[in-house]
Amino acid sequence: MALPPVYIVSTARTPIGSFQGSLSSLTYSDLGAHAVKAALAKVPQIKPQDVDEIVFGGVLQANVGQAPARQVALKAGLPDSIVASTINKVCASGMKAVIIGAQNIICGTSDIVVVGGAESMSNTPYYLPSARSGARYGDAIMVDGVQKDGLLDVYEEKLMGVAAEKCAKDHGFSREDQDNFAINSYKKAGKALSEGKFKSEIAPVTIKGFRGKPDTVIENDEEIGKFNEERLKSARTVFQKENGTVTAPNASKLNDGGAALVLVSEAKLKQLGLKPLAKISGWGEAARTPFDFTIAPALAVPKAVKHAGLTVDRVDFFELNEAFSVVGLANAELVNIPLEKLNVYGGAVAMGHPLGCSGARIIVTLLSVLTQEGGRFGVAGVCNGGGGASAVVIEKIDADAKL
């Protein structure tokens, strides 16, 4: 049975800031609202009161405040009547938000849905668990919220990077393989930046100056400019001291950012005279043993491709979130994705990985790739802690449509 079409009519994202870097003064809701405002500004036919709901991803929610997605919506100027849902599927949160938004349109409960995700990893607090019951005597332990709720496998009680080391060993990828993948990610991202490939998707952020200092406009992803090939090759391994392969430079970083997409039904597309950028053709989700989350996209991507009525060889470009270089390498090998079709503008190793944002960000970038490099079908996939993964297939509708 053919499903009713769901169209992407606008996308936008913030630049991605480094940990404690250029965007660290902004909260989750600041980052999300900026992306939402920018996406809606590109489609003036859609008035704030026309938007039925917002579905927004966010992982590190401690101290963010009640109902984070609702905060994003109201800060972006959407009306009090907006229905808001916050999604936490770890790194796949932003993509799950896109899937839910599309499903709601297909079900007929909404016609216009703003979807996406954000994360301010810089502002995630430390926890003091013993304070609730009273730390009556002696030292009290502080818990890093980023690590506890974002980067730690709760079943093995080991960091995500240890799982990446397991993946490298299981699939035979060396330190050199991962370093070369990371170097290529940085070089592709640097080339895309220098050629202006990200301009259509990035909404520059103005950071207010203080104590007489001028405002600062952040226009580019902060991590890309930090690339140093020699330092990357000489970096120490982080998660496994002896015979380890995963380093800080060949893994994604801790980051801040937000991304948003505007989805509409076919009826609303025609009623408002909107020009579609792409159609959401299918999606797939899968899960396996929690500590093997790194290769869960190898299950989700084929499911999404099948759901869209395609085969992998018909897909023009792929975006796989580079939580670690080995994630890109292993899943490309398992799904038979040619590396020349993968992350052609670089990935999270070079650009950064704000957890709740990334699943939406890679769809935004995938659409940029399809638009500027001449493709029709694209697949975005992302693994998530706990053993899961999500994937989305999009089809470029109009080669002349501008982002």
Swiss-Prot record:
The protein's assembly and partners: Multimeric.
Pathway per the UniProt entry: Metabolic intermediate biosynthesis; (R)-mevalonate biosynthesis; (R)-mevalonate from acetyl-CoA: step 1/3
Catalytic activity: 2 acetyl-CoA = acetoacetyl-CoA + CoA
Family stated for the protein in its record: Belongs to the thiolase-like superfamily. Thiolase family.
Gene3D superfamilies with a match to the protein in the record: 3.40.47.10
UniProt-recorded name of the protein: Acetyl-CoA acetyltransferase IA
Keyword Acyltransferase: yes
The protein's Enzyme Commission number: 2.3.1.9
Key words, A-Z: Acyltransferase, Peroxisome, Transferase
GO cellular component: mitochondrion; peroxisome
